[in-house]
Design a protein with these regions (language model features):
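Cofactor-binding beta-sheet edge motifs in enzyme active sites
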Residues: 2-23, 33-290
Length: 290
């Protein structure tokens, strides 16, 4: 058996999931000078806003037809009090700073709802403070709605775009401050649960969307999981890849015995230089399961 080590597999191939668990809400904010030069405000790790007032939510879950990017962006936008037309999404790299980047079992909303809500809410608070300062009014007399900070006593307002154009926001929230933010109640939602245009549809229609099969980096290999007989308890006790070695481009086999999600026992992956090579190798490899 041509076995590939865990380290070699992760270093030498593209990864569809991140294997570092946990996340931090501690801000990844640019300095005032960097913010001006880059024309953007990085609030927390998963949200960036620019001087047009556009909010880009960084999605670290995989889009598989369920429009997860739109759903996660709705959570941020709800507390941010921003117009839906001012919201975008993107899919960042697989750097470990993003935490566990796995998608499945309806985890995405469950695991990130509170986090995304507090990201949006803290950004709203920072914008209200900056907007009140621009209008020379008390921040406690202001509220945010539809991409604007409004002074309750005079109805005077400044848009998020104006605020981000004229101010450099360096507001940092501690973990304690984030946890103390009062979030909206179910009956107060105006974005969550509403039928809104999906943010990823235009790219899918015009052909610019990048799918997993489109990904390519030099020297990458393709992997094909060999199904196990049962989800729990199945362990490979012998892997015979003699026939797979006859397939052009076959690289080896990776046996995973430490699933980071803890929802599967272990699995075997056939590796090859091409997609179809991996498909053929997976069928040729014989696995004896316990």
């Amino acid at each position: 058996m041509h076995n590939i080590s865990r380290r070699k597999f992760l270093v030498g191939t593209t990864k569809s999931i991140g294997l570092v668990a946990g996340f931090s809400l501690v801000p990844n904010i640019l300095s005032a000078k960097e913010a001006i030069n880059n024309k953007r405000w990085d609030h927390q790790l998963f949200l960036t806003m620019d001087t047009k007032g556009t909010a880009t939510v960084h999605i670290t879950k995989t889009e598989m037809g369920q429009h997860i990017g739109t759903a996660l962006a709705q959570i941020v936008a709800e507390e941010l009090e921003i117009n839906w037309d001012d919201v975008k999404i993107d899919y960042p790299d697989s750097h470990k700073k993003w935490g566990l980047m796995i998608t499945g079992s309806s985890w995405s909303i469950n695991w990130t709802f509170d986090r995304n809500s507090r990201i949006g809410a803290s950004a709203r608070i920072a914008l209200i403070e900056a907007g009140a300062n621009l209008m020379s009014v008390n921040k406690d007399d202001c509220y945010a709605k539809e991409s604007k900070v409004i002074h309750k006593l005079t109805n005077k307002f400044v848009t998020y775009s104006e605020i981000l154009t004229r101010k450099s926001i360096n507001r940092i929230f501690s973990e304690e401050e984030l946890k103390a933010i009062k979030l909206k109640k179910f009956g107060e939602y105006r974005i969550i649960g509403k039928s809104l245009p999906s943010l990823d549809v235009p790219e899918k229609i015009n052909g610019t969307a990048k799918y997993g099969i489109d990904a390519f980096i030099p020297n990458m290999v393709y992997g094909k999981i060999i199904p196990w007989p049962t989800r729990y308890g199945s362990k490979p006790i012998n892997v015979d890849d003699k026939e797979a070695k006859k397939i052009p481009g076959y690289v080896g086999v990776y046996v995973n015995k430490d699933d980071p999600t803890k929802v599967n026992s272990s699995y075997v992956i056939a590796l090859a230089e091409t997609f179809w090579g991996a498909e053929k190798a997976a069928k040729a490899i014989k696995v004896k399961w316990d």
